[in-house]
Every structure is written in structure tokens, then in C-alpha cells.
A protein has these predicted regions:
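Conserved NAD(P)H cofactor-binding loop of Rossmann-fold oxidoreductase domains
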Residues: 76-82, 237
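Alpha-helical segment proximal to the catalytic Tyr-Lys
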Residues: 114, 156-161, 225
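Residue(s) in the substrate-gating loop at a strand-loop-helix junction
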Residues: 128
């Protein structure tokens, strides 16, 4: 029998790569994402799609209600806005980033827990290295991802032993989502020097989506059945917690 996986933000670069990998391992995959994002970045053939918006509580509830029971849930949704020091950021910008990276994930996770408990499933949250090692001009995003890690650990305690909850925290990946969130903001908002990132990384390259997919699939699998409340830092050795 196929295992069932829902991917929040599944039309993003990490989500599409994860969908492809999960389909190749005979998972039934449902992508949850904005209609505009799915139209712009079609998901791999074989995946189901349900539309969701992390700024629409009613739509979140109805979309999750329509799902069947799940073996896995991956929260790959998220975006950052333009790079600014905190003193130059307006409150509405902060609220948008916190909602899209933390509050929305909190809401969908809360709604989806009964679907996972029925099959003793696993949750994987996609955090960020900026949660542990912040950099200037990423204040709201760093705070949101740090909150997501705290949420991961708290939830792991609360839902054990029925559901495992872990996180993957990657370094910078050259995707549309790190450049503003496909479907919500412009994809060229941020100017990140990936050549410099590569030079500063012991493995001498920036991360790819495939680098992130492997650890996610591991945390969804029975190979990690004794892991919960943990964070896998996937960063090429650029920082070592």
C-alpha cells in the first residue's frame, strides 16, 4: 500500500524536488500551495494538487479537511522579503513574513495532526540556518525560522509517541522562495552572492534542492523512527552547531 505525503509549499523548488523523489519511491503525494504558484511552477506529473493560502484561515481549514489520512507532512512553505535592517522594516512587512513562515505553518500543522495520528506519521519542517546563525537584514525571517524550530521541538514533545516531528535547516539555496516566495513577491528581490557563499563553505559549493531532499526523505522514513525533536543542519559545513 502506498504511503501518503502532503507537502505544504510543494510547488516551490524544494517542494517540487521532494515531490519527484517521493513519487519515485511510490508515495502518494499531495501538493498544497497557492494557485498562482502552481500555475507558474507546475508540479511533477503524478502528484495531486490542493490550493491553500497561509493568509486565508478558512481556506486552510477546508483544504486540510479534504485530505485523507497521512504518513507524512512536510512544511516547505516560506519566503523572505527585501533585505533591510530592522529599523527600516515596516510592521506590515514583519507580519507578512511571520505569517508566511511561522503562523501559517502552525495553523496547518494543528489542523493536520489528526490525519497523521491515524497512521503514526512524521512531520518535517523546513527551517533555516539563519535561525541559529542570523545575519544582518534578515531579521523577520530569522525570527520566524527560529520560532519554527522551537515549534518543532515543542510539538515533538506534545504528540509523541504517535507522531514524530523533526526539522531540516539548510543554508542558502538559490531558489525563487529565498528570493521572495514564488507567487507572492518578486523572484528577484534579493541579491545574494552565491559565488561568495560557495567560497565560504568547506564543501565549496552552494546547496542544491537535492541536497535538502535526501535528509527530508530520511526523516520521513522508518530509518529515522527513533528520532524526534531534532534538527538536521544541511549547510556544507559552513556552520557547525
Amino acid at each position: 500500500m502506498k504511503k501518503s505525503l502532503a507537502i505544504l509549499g510543494g510547488a516551490g523548488a524544494i517542494g517540487r524536488a521532494l515531490t519527484k523523489a517521493a513519487l519515485s519511491e511510490n508515495w502518494h503525494v499531495t501538493v498544497l500551495d497557492l494557485r498562482k504558484t502552481v500555475d507558474t511552477y507546475p508540479v511533477p506529473e503524478g502528484a495531486d494538487v490542493k490550493y491553500i493560502d497561509l493568509f486565508d484561515e478558512q481556506l486552510m481549514a477546508s483544504t486540510v479537511e479534504a485530505l485523507g489520512n497521512l504518513n507524512g507532512f512536510v512544511n516547505a512553505a516560506g519566503f523572505t522579503s527585501s533585505m533591510k535592517p530592522i529599523q527600516n522594516i515596516e510592521l506590515d512587512e514583519i507580519n507578512e513574513v511571520i505569517q508566511g513562515n511561522l503562523v501559517g505553518a502552525f495553523t496547518v500543522t494543528k489542523l493536520i495532526l489528526p490525519k497523521l495520528k491515524a497512521k503514526q506519521g512524521a512531520i518535517v519542517n523546513i527551517a533555516s540556518g539563519l535561525a541559529q546563525y542570523p545575519r544582518p537584514n534578515f531579521g523577520p525571517y530569522s525570527a520566524a525560522k527560529a520560532g519554527l524550530i522551537s515549534l518543532t521541538k515543542t510539538l515533538a514533545l506534545e504528540v509523541a509517541p504517535d507522531i514524530r516531528v523533526n526539522a531540516v535547516a539548510p543554508s542558502a539555496i538559490d531558489t525563487d522562495f529565498i528570493r521572495g516566495g514564488a507567487g507572492r513577491n518578486k523572484a528577484d528581490q534579493l541579491d545574494i552572492d552565491f559565488k561568495m557563499v560557495s567560497e565560504m563553505t568547506p564543501l565549496k559549493r552552494a546547496a542544491t534542492t537535492e541536497d535538502i531532499v535526501g535528509p527530508i526523505m530520511f526523516l520521513l522514513s522508518d530509518a529515522s523512527q527513533y528520532m524526534t525533536g531534532q534538527v538536521l543542519w544541511v549547510n556544507g559545513g559552513s556552520y557547525m552547531p
